[in-house]
Amino acid sequence: MNVALGGTFDPVHDGHRALFERAFELGDVTVGLTSDELAPKTRHVDRYVRSFAERKRDLETELEPLAAEYDREFAVHELTEPTGIATEPRFDALVVSPETVDTGERINELREDAGVDPLDIVVVDHVIAEDGDVISSTRIVNGEIDEHGNVTPDRDGRDATR
């Protein structure tokens, strides 16, 4: 099975890791990583996002051990628009978080319009931080939690330029 998922992944956290693990359980994985131009447009909160090259490097570091563990292949492709690679016929499934289910449904509409079979949309629940809220990159960048969801009240967040 060929599995797709996409995002900005800045920084990678345990919520992303849950998505990656589920994807590798299903098959070979292709991750669409938002381009430098697209990344800020996908943010619900205006914040600095590291460069594509930095994010790709960190993402590959996360994916390599999972690929080895599940004996799967993976690739990272640049996304220049939100529906990205998932409209390509080679994919069978799309792994999404609860807030990106709508994007998955939109991708299936585009696939249907193009005469391509719909993807199985696999929803992975949020991972909850120790304070009971969802782990998110924005919360990490703001200094509220670390990548594992531990509360970090004494930590400063990332500033607007790093």
Which residues does each predicted region cover?
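Nucleotidyltransferase catalytic core that binds NTPs
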Residues: 1-162
